[in-house]
Design a protein with these regions (language model features):
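Residue-level marker for the onset of beta-strands and adjacent loop->beta junctions
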Residues: 11-12, 19, 49, 121-123
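Hydrophobic alpha-helical segments of small multi-pass membrane proteins
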Residues: 100-105, 119-127
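A charged, solvent-exposed segment within the mature domains of Sec-exported extracytoplasmic proteins
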Residues: 122-156
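Residues that define the transmembrane beta-barrel architecture of outer-membrane proteins
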Residues: 32, 45-49, 75-81, 95, ...
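Transmembrane beta-strand segments that form the barrel wall of outer-membrane beta-barrel proteins
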Residues: 32-42, 61-72, 99-107, 132-142
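Gram-negative (and chloroplast) outer-membrane scaffold detector with strong preference
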Residues: 50-113, 155-156
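Cleavable N-terminal export/targeting peptides
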Residues: 1-32
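Outer-membrane beta-barrel architecture
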Residues: 37, 50-54, 84-86, 124-128, ...
């Protein structure tokens, strides 16, 4: 069995390749931009960090926001690829609410050299400022982390 560091390195390369392919196939995606995110999760209890890319509206106010999150703690490293869609509610204020969800692929690497790949689904709600700052709450079902509280920034 390969060392954990090698497996993580290979997985991260695959995940980044998938994310780059998603970005490369979208012609108008540059209109919205990339972003960074971080926060805490419950079950597993972890700190997480990652990145995302938000597309322009696909229809009405529905955006595609795929993201990659890496969680550390609770004797496991979690790498999640989330294929999330968000609907942004109309607002005249500097803050706007949004809600959404989407499927996830979760890679779990345990301290005892075991690993698992599980599918999941996330539901999310959040608030974003027009400048790009956002706060988000995710609820995971199936085999996604149960709850995530996050903050992030989308570069516009």
């Amino acid at each position: 069995m390969a060392p954990v560091a090698y497996r993580l390195s290979s997985r991260v390369k695959v995940l980044l390749t998938v994310l780059l392919l998603v970005l490369a196939t979208s012609t108008q995606a540059w209109a919205q931009g990339p972003g960074v995110r971080g926060g805490v999760s419950i079950d597993p209890d972890q700190f997480y960090f990652g990145g995302h890319y938000e597309t322009p509206p696909l229809v009405d106010r529905l955006h595609f926001r795929p993201n990659l999150e890496v969680g550390i703690g609770d004797d496991v490293v979690t790498t999640a690829i989330n294929f999330e869609f968000v609907y942004k509610f109309p607002s005249r204020s500097p803050w706007r609410l949004y809600a959404g969800g989407g499927p996830a692929v979760n890679f779990y690497s345990f301290d005892n050299d075991n690993s698992e790949t599980e599918g999941g689904f996330n539901f999310l709600i959040g608030a974003e400022q027009r400048s790009g700052l956002f706060f988000e709450l995710k609820v995971g079902v199936i085999d996604s982390p149960d709850l995530k509280f996050g903050v992030g920034y989308t570069f516009r």
